Amino acid sequence: MNMKTITLFTSILIMAIFSSSALATLSHLDQAIQHAEAAVKSDEGEAVAKHSRMSKSHANASKGDKDIQIDRKHLDQGIESLNVAISEGNDGNAEAAQEAATEAIQHFRHATLHTNH
């Protein structure tokens, strides 16, 4: 290999490392919001419940995030909304489940309004 090839390969490798670490910086609460948004977009109750469970898992994990400040009141209210979304989704009531997931998103966004990220 010549020097230009080695330099090009090294540059690509460094860019790949930095871009993958940038992707990994989403907080658990950010991921909870993403899954709740997917729940709202789902058409079937079971799918809403599935995404809501994933959202709830990340929301609970966010309680251990040390990098950001989270308003626990809104976080807990969002988790309660997800519980409703899961229950309604499991019962096949997609519309009510979507509404509850929408409420969860609102609570999670309020929980992060005064964060440092």
Task: Annotate each PLM feature.
Residues M1-A24:
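Classic N-terminal secretory signal peptides
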Residues S20-H117:
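Long, charged/polar, soluble alpha-helical segments
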